[in-house]
Amino acid sequence: VELWDPYDDMASTHPLDRTLYVRHQAIRKMIERWGTNNGASAVVEHGANPGMVSHLVKQALTDITTQLLTDGKAGSRASSLQTALEAQQFNVLAQLTGTKVIHIAERDTQVSSKPKLTNEFCNTWSVEGFYEEGVAPAELGWGTHEKWMPANAHAHTDDGPRNQICLAQPGMESWVRSWVPSGDTLGMIIRHGESYTMTHHLTVKNTDGTDAYRPTVHYAYHPSDAAINSVLELRMRNWQMQPKERIFNDEIIDGRDELGVLLMGHDYKSWWTGSTLSIHEARAIIPNQSATTVQVAGSVVGAITWLLDCPSEGVRVPDELPWKKVLDATRPYIGPIHSAPSDWTPLKNRNDLFPGYGNDTSLLDHSDPWQFANFLAPTPY
């Protein structure tokens, strides 16, 4: 899905033409031209995210549904939820549970014994990969519940699912409120393929082919403190990459990578499912790596396991793989999976220092906490 030179003609290329949506649509049309998709197996975009997170969403929907049925909160939905659960109809489960928003919610707290230097970009994984994603337009799957769209948002008008929008601003400058088990976070809307595939596979159609239900899906990434400082310096350099790069490995002395999915809008408000792998746990699994790289590598192992067992299934995205099988193959590398509810909303702990004097009252929607404007930080005008 990546381009050899993604920076060519950046200023003159329309933001929509720089999206992963366009690239995924090109793959879909290529497969359609073949007339069949029964050749050698190939998995598109399967690391930790995109990749493992698609399976974690199915784990989360399974856990939410099971909890609703156990707690007696399902009400008139009980029979339909049970049927959809048994049939593994995750789009129906997402709709019936009331899931409106899904964040790939990640916070990296790994710290190094060697501080970031001036004019150096530091990260716990590929510096070049982060830069390429970060300067691209913020891109997100757009839910059917959304009432308001930012002024700089652009929607697709092609013959595809049109399940995404993009913002005419870099993902590194697009921040949202989110949550991980350690607490509230601010995350960047870095473009990722799961925003396309996950939204597409969780869509429920009306009989006339229109979309009856679709959640908002996007990345909410808070990297390590050194990477945050690197991004700030990159912005000060007017997006000209620093001359020095460093990927943290053996110099990491503490911290963890909380990487999971945050499903919001259902009866429990929020539910986070994912890996909370620490650097110490990661080193016990694979020496000389960070928690981040172990999570990614383990997720690749999961995909390879499926490829070896199913060599003639054609081109697939993570959402089309047997989620339990792939996730089970990944588990030895990501530590115990945390899956539990939280009563968090983007409005719960909000602290506007100048309430009523800014724009907080014009766009905040207290009647529906799961509106996109409630997540944006700062609140847009």
What are these regions (language model features)?
Residues N38-V43, S178-S182:
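Flexible glycine/proline-enriched surface loops and loop-helix/loop-strand junctions
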Residues H46-H55:
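Domain-scale recognition of functional cores that engage charged ligands
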Residues L56-A60:
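Alpha-helical scaffold elements adjacent to nucleotide-binding pockets in ATP/GTP-utilizing enzyme cores
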Residues H14-R18, A48, A291:
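Alpha-helix capping and helix-loop boundary segments enriched in small/acidic/polar residues
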Residues D8-D9, G51-M52, S113:
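Short catalytic/ligand-binding loop motif for oxyanion handling, primarily in non-cytosolic enzymes
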Residues V1-G39:
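Rossmann-fold NAD(P)-binding glycine/threonine-rich loop
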Residues E2, A42-V44, I104:
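General beta-strand structural signal in soluble alpha/beta enzymes
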Residues D63-Y381:
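C-terminal catalytic/substrate-binding lobe primarily of soluble NAD(P)-dependent oxidoreductases
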